[in-house]
C-alpha cells in the first residue's frame, strides 16, 4: 500500500472509530495492522490518543452507551501506541477466548444428518463414537 493511501484509509478508520458496526465489520480483520500504522505515524498517533482519551473520559463519566467492543479496541490501540495498558475504571475486559463446557456423554442423535464412524478393524458402525473422545483442560499460561 502506498503511504498516502494507507494514511487515508487509517484516517477513515479513526474517524469512524466510535461507530462499532462500521469498525468491526469493515476493519475487523485489519485492526492490529491499523494500530501499528497509527503508532508509527506521529500525526495519526496524536489524533488517535485524543480520540482514545475522549472515549475513556466519556466511559468513566458514565456514558456506557459506547459499545464495549469499541472501548476494547481503543484499549488495544492504546497498548500498541503507548506500550502499556490504560487503567480504565469500570470496564470489564472482553477476553478473546470463548469458554464453554459441554457434556459429550449426553450427546444423542436427534434425527440430524451426521457422520457415521466405523471401527477400524471390524468395519462395523460405532454406536456412540464420542465415547472414546478425550477432552483435557489445559492452562495456556503453562505454555507461554
Swiss-Prot record:
Alphabetical list of Pfam families matching this protein: Swm2 (PF17083)
Entry's Gene Ontology BP terms: 7-methylguanosine cap hypermethylation; tRNA processing
Listed InterPro entries: Swm2
Lineage: superkingdom: Eukaryota
Major subcellular location class: nucleus
GO terms under cellular component: nucleolus
Lineage: Eukaryota, Fungi, Dikarya, Ascomycota, Saccharomycotina
UniProt entry tagged with the keyword Transmembrane: no
Keywords: Nucleus
Family: Belongs to the SWM2 family.
UniProt keyword Amino-acid biosynthesis, yes or no: no
Protein name: Nucleolar protein SWM2
Subcellular compartments: Nucleus, Nucleolus
Amino acid at each position: 500500500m502506498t503511504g498516502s493511501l494507507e494514511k487515508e484509509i487509517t484516517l477513515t478508520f479513526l474517524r469512524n472509530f466510535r461507530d462499532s458496526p462500521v469498525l468491526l465489520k469493515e476493519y475487523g480483520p485489519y485492526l492490529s495492522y491499523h494500530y501499528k500504522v497509527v503508532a508509527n505515524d506521529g500525526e495519526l498517533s496524536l489524533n488517535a490518543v485524543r480520540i482514545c482519551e475522549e472515549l475513556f473520559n466519556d466511559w468513566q463519566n458514565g456514558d456506557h452507551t459506547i459499545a464495549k467492543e469499541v472501548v476494547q479496541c481503543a484499549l488495544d490501540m492504546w497498548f500498541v501506541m503507548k506500550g502499556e495498558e490504560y487503567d480504565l475504571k469500570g470496564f470489564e475486559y472482553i477476553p478473546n477466548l470463548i469458554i464453554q463446557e459441554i457434556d459429550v456423554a449426553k450427546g444423542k442423535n436427534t434425527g440430524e444428518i451426521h457422520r457415521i464412524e466405523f471401527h477400524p478393524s471390524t468395519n462395523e458402525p460405532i454406536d456412540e463414537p464420542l465415547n472414546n473422545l478425550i477432552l483435557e483442560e489445559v492452562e495456556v499460561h503453562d505454555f507461554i
